[in-house]
Amino acid sequence: MTILSEIVKYKQSLLQNGYYQDKLNTLKSVKIQNKKSFINAIEKEPKLAIIAEIKSKSPTVNDLPERDLSQQISDYDQYGANAVSILTDEKYFSGSFERLQALTTKTTLPVLCKDFIIDPLQIDVAKQAGASMILLIVNILSDKQLKDLYNYAISQNLEVLVEVHDRHELERAYKVNAKLIGVNNRDLKRFVTNVEHTNTILENKKTNHYYISESGIHDASDVRKILHSGIDGLLIGEALMRCDNLSEFLPQLKMQKVKS
């Protein structure tokens, strides 16, 4: 069993045990009308748009420094991030919907609920906690699930980042006409990353979609390796959480887009 299938099994058990219904019943609703649109930001931004992540740990990383997360969000905002990603999985990533709820009020930037969504109820909880964007991972969804969840999220006025790991999944993302597509550079079987995976997947990409490179981006040299793939933005977590000088580091990553 891969780590991803293990996580999905865990999410299914949470759904069956009423975890998400309890969250919906107990979390105070956070209004997100003041949130900016990430897609609008991409359209207007001549430089790469940055989704800056709040992350405590992952199945492969356990030694991230503890940060004042309110200050981290403020720094992301101040130094040029275009959106914030907040992990809400408790078991594998030490996140929570309560954390999302507390931090989303600290910024007007779009906030992505990064989780493993397989059911509309999870989308309801994400929205109630104050997310303005959600993540859908093509690899863990059937075509019908992907279409239904995508359309449901859009109907709830949420933006959707559809994540792909290979060219076949990219074609599946095109089928639902996903406007915002994330290319994950992590090998799902071995959980290792290669940033140039983005170049391979986007070699024959379609126009009229926006592309975000995710995972394995540690510095400006990594960004330069994938800039000519025609990406519109980056999702970066670990490198930002480790950085003690965001005022210099974050602007370095916001390179001029290269349209291929």
UniProtKB/Swiss-Prot annotation:
<dbReference type="InterPro" id="IPR001468">
    <property type="entry name" value="Indole-3-GlycerolPSynthase_CS"/>
</dbReference>
<dbReference type="InterPro" id="IPR013798">
    <property type="entry name" value="Indole-3-glycerol_P_synth_dom"/>
</dbReference>
<dbReference type="Pfam" id="PF00218">
    <property type="entry name" value="IGPS"/>
</dbReference>
<dbReference type="GO" id="GO:0004640">
    <property type="term" value="F:phosphoribosylanthranilate isomerase activity"/>
</dbReference>
<keyword id="KW-0057">Aromatic amino acid biosynthesis</keyword>
<keyword id="KW-0456">Lyase</keyword>
<dbReference type="InterPro" id="IPR013785">
    <property type="entry name" value="Aldolase_TIM"/>
</dbReference>
<keyword id="KW-0822">Tryptophan biosynthesis</keyword>
<dbReference type="InterPro" id="IPR045186">
    <property type="entry name" value="Indole-3-glycerol_P_synth"/>
</dbReference>
<comment type="similarity">
    <text>Belongs to the TrpC family.</text>
</comment>
<dbReference type="InterPro" id="IPR011060">
    <property type="entry name" value="RibuloseP-bd_barrel"/>
</dbReference>
<keyword id="KW-0028">Amino-acid biosynthesis</keyword>
<comment type="pathway">
    <text>Amino-acid biosynthesis; L-tryptophan biosynthesis; L-tryptophan from chorismate: step 4/5.</text>
</comment>
<dbReference type="GO" id="GO:0000162">
    <property type="term" value="P:L-tryptophan biosynthetic process"/>
</dbReference>
<keyword id="KW-0210">Decarboxylase</keyword>
<dbReference type="GO" id="GO:0004425">
    <property type="term" value="F:indole-3-glycerol-phosphate synthase activity"/>
</dbReference>
<protein>
    <recommendedName>
        <fullName>Indole-3-glycerol phosphate synthase</fullName>
        <ecNumber>4.1.1.48</ecNumber>
    </recommendedName>
</protein>
